[in-house]
Swiss-Prot record:
Its main location: cytoplasm. GO terms for molecular function: GTP binding; GTPase activity; translation elongation factor activity. SUPFAM superfamilies: EF-Tu/eEF-1alpha/eIF2-gamma C-terminal domain, P-loop containing nucleoside triphosphate hydrolases, Translation proteins. This is Elongation factor 1-alpha. It comes from Solanum lycopersicum (Tomato). InterPro entries: EFTu-like_2, G_TR_CS, GTP-eEF1A_C, P-loop_NTPase, T_Tr_GTP-bd_dom, TRAFAC_GTPase_members, Transl_B-barrel_sf, Transl_elong_EF1A/Init_IF2_C. Pfam families: GTP-eEF1A_C, GTP_EFTU, GTP_EFTU_D2. The keyword Kinase does not apply. The modification N6,N6,N6-trimethyllysine is found at K79, K187, K306, K396. The modification 5-glutamyl glycerylphosphorylethanolamine is found at E289, E362.
Length: 448
């Protein structure tokens, strides 16, 4: 086997009809882990239903449908391999909760693949003021997805077909837009493709012989290797807590930063409960240590299930332990709110695995969302499209960290009226020391 490939996550973004599913489906179909039998079954069904256009989106639609019906589709189906990487596709957008998932999502994307519809009218709709292309790109940048690949899709349907002039026009316009968002377009490959016909997806296309850059597959291989934050202090937000007969209390979650290992004394923020880790498991195998990205269960001593909740954060008691936030200041971008947001607004914040109402105590400044420059001090309100620095106060104890120190615990979605109305990143936190926190006997013994 040789050295195992590096795992990376990509998020596929773009306007609703840009061909995201077809393109993603194509990659997964050609390079991925979809079982041949499953493909054959789909192809047979497609033929019976006269779905001549079977191609690739259909694979994805089937997978989505099965996933939404609660048939657990092996998540491996959303993976594919390049020469260098194992790629996982994070919840392809179009999904209503996409924005929320992208923020609180199980993993930070290492690269965004922006799909553009190159056809006449299609491109214009996607990039227009209210098109999703802009919003998705802004979101990706704000949330720290610094690498991007741009695919000019549907080149088989431009006028004339595979038109270089059309490609050049799109590259020019999208570049100027991405520059405004904060990306450096010179570092972004613009790959002309057809997700449907397969041009330049994996093999170089003779239809596009005027193009000399990388294919989509080559561009994915050229992504800079992500640095994993295993050298930072431990942060492990809890997703669930189980009581397992004969073992005891087992919190479950994903290591975001640092490492967790048996024998470590952990402190759970925001309560300060401190205890010893007896064992760490992943996929029913005991681990000597778990690293960032690992989804693990770990057994803790002398702790009742009721003392731990989803949204609590496990940390190393001897290395910057997690604490609750008395208040914090965040840069917030309002994306989807019908009215005005003023002081006293109290929506729900989704940050890592916690879901807690937070009060906008004070809107400190309105800022230019691209440059970060201050536009106005203490504005009366913020509305759609505005960005501001806001002082927030959680209504219940919760752990947040600055985006600079612990990115996955420093980005959040603001939810109201069952939708994401804003996104934000935490700039600084006023932490409070827990009072009367329980330290178990096991932890006390360890501490001696």
């Amino acid at each position: 086997m040789g050295k195992e490939k590096i795992h990376i996550s990509i998020v596929v973004i773009g306007h609703v009809d840009s061909g995201k599913s077809t393109t993603t489906g194509h990659l997964i179909y050609k390079l991925g882990g979809i079982d041949k039998r499953v493909i054959e079954r789909f192809e047979k069904e497609a033929a019976e239903m006269n779905k001549r256009s079977f191609k690739y989106a259909w694979v994805l639609d089937k997978l989505k449908a099965e996933r939404e019906r609660g048939i657990t589709i092996d998540i491996a189906l959303w993976k594919f391999e390049t020469t260098k990487y194992y790629c996982t596709v994070i919840d392809a957008p179009g999904h209503r909760d996409f924005i929320k998932n992208m923020i609180t999502g199980t993993s930070q994307a290492d690269c965004a693949v922006l799909i553009i519809d190159s056809t006449t009218g299609g491109f214009e709709a996607g990039i227009s003021k209210d098109g999703q292309t802009r919003e998705h790109a802004l979101l990706a940048f704000t949330l720290g997805v610094k690498q991007m690949i741009c695919c000019c899709n549907k080149m088989d349907a431009t006028t004339p077909k595979y038109s270089k002039a059309r490609y050049d026009e799109i590259v020019k316009e999208v570049s100027s837009y991405l520059k405004k968002v904060g990306y450096n377009p010179d570092k972004i490959p613009f790959v002309p493709i057809s997700g449907f016909e397969g041009d330049n997806m994996i093999e170089r296309s003779t239809n596009l012989d005027w193009y000399k850059g990388p294919t989509l597959l080559e561009a994915l291989d050229q992504i800079n290797e992500p640095k994993r934050p295993s050298d930072k202090p431990l942060r492990l937000p809890l997703q669930d807590v189980y009581k397992i007969g004969g073992i005891g209390t087992v919190p479950v979650g994903r290591v975001e930063t640092g490492v967790i290992k048996p024998g470590m004394v952990v402190t759970f923020g925001p309560t300060g409960l401190t205890t010893e880790v007896k064992s760490v498991e992943m996929h029913h195998e005991a681990l000597q240590e778990a690293l960032p990205g690992d989804n693990v269960g770990f057994n803790v001593k002398n702790v009742a299930v009721k003392d731990l909740k989803r949204g609590y954060v496990a940390s190393n008691s001897k290395d910057d332990p997690a604490k609750g936030a008395a208040s914090f200041t965040a840069q917030v971008i309002i994306m989807n709110h019908p009215g005005q947001i003023g002081n006293g607004y109290a929506p729900v914040l989704d940050c890592h695995t916690s879901h807690i109402a937070v009060k906008f105590a004070e809107i400190l400044t309105k800022i230019d969302r691209r440059s970060g420059k201050e536009l106005e001090k203490e504005p009366k309100f913020l509305k759609n499209g505005d960005a501001g620095m806001v002082k927030m106060i959680p209504t219940k104890p919760m752990v947040v960290e600055t985006f600079a120190e612990y990115p996955p615990l420093g980005r959040f979605a603001v939810r109201d009226m069952r939708q994401t109305v804003a996104v934000g990143v935490v700039k600084n936190v006023d932490k409070k020391d827990p009072t009367g926190a329980k330290v178990t006997k096991a932890a006390q013994k360890k501490g001696k």
